[in-house]
Regions:
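Solvent-exposed edge beta-strands and adjacent loop segments
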Residues: 1-76, 123-139
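Repeat-unit-sized solenoid/scaffold elements
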Residues: 3, 77-80, 91-105, 132-143, ...
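Hydrophobic transmembrane signal anchors and adjacent membrane-proximal interface regions, especially
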Residues: 4, 9-12, 51, 89, ...
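Short secondary-structure transition/capping segments
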Residues: 9-11, 110-112, 145-149
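Short amphipathic beta-strand/extended segments with alternating polar/hydrophobic composition
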Residues: 22-26, 114-121, 159-163
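Structured, beta-strand-rich domain cores
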Residues: 52-118
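Mixed-charge, glycine-accented linear interaction segment located at domain edges/termini
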Residues: 122-182
Length: 182
């Protein structure tokens, strides 16, 4: 398989302990997503040899780089106070747990498929803000945020599903995010 595209970074409010999602939205346009799982490891040595080895998931580091960070993200993800065209930051604001998904296009044996991923419990933190003058060439500055994904009490931390069409992948992300049809 070869991944050839990335789109639709989806965020949804996570309500615990029911672990349900609501109010999904597209968090800008995806530029890059990095997911790096972290593991706890242990070895048992007996009779002068390695007798056992275990490795289990702890959490995953996530970096999300998008074209923009919508105002809605500041409220749902970071706990800031928002209005239609403004964000107010307070020292007491706390990041909230969310569900996070996205879709990638891939080619498998020459056939295009769409893979959607959903991470069940993620807490993002705001990144460094950087601004530059325009200068002779146009250089885009885009927001990048980091976070950690962790497992739910039942051990699930991520789902991945492959679809024949992009529309099916997007519908699955919307469903995972708790979108209801009106």
């Amino acid at each position: 398989m070869a991944y050839i595209g990335l789109a639709r970074p989806t965020i949804a409010k996570l309500t615990e302990p029911a672990n349900t999602y609501a109010d999904p939205f597209t968090c800008g346009r995806a530029i890059q997503i990095d997911i790096t799982p972290q593991f706890a490891e242990g070895s048992l040595y007996a009779d002068d040899i390695k007798a056992e080895y275990d490795k289990e998931f702890k959490y995953a580091d996530i970096t999300l780089n998008t074209s923009t960070l919508p105002i809605k993200a500041h409220e749902i993800m970071f706990g800031h106070t928002t209005a239609e065209d403004s964000v107010t930051y307070k020292a007491s604001d706390e990041s909230k747990y969310v569900g996070f998904g996205f879709r990638v296009a891939e080619k498998v044996d020459g056939v295009r498929k769409y893979t959607a991923s959903w991470l069940y419990k993620v807490k993002f933190t705001e990144g460094q803000e950087s601004y530059k003058v325009k200068g002779d060439n146009i250089e885009y500055q885009t927001p990048s945020i980091t976070g950690q994904a962790m497992a739910l009490p039942d051990g699930r931390w991520k789902d991945v599903k492959i679809f024949d069409t992009e529309a099916e992948a997007i519908a699955w992300l919307d469903e995972k995010g708790g979108k209801t049809t009106d």
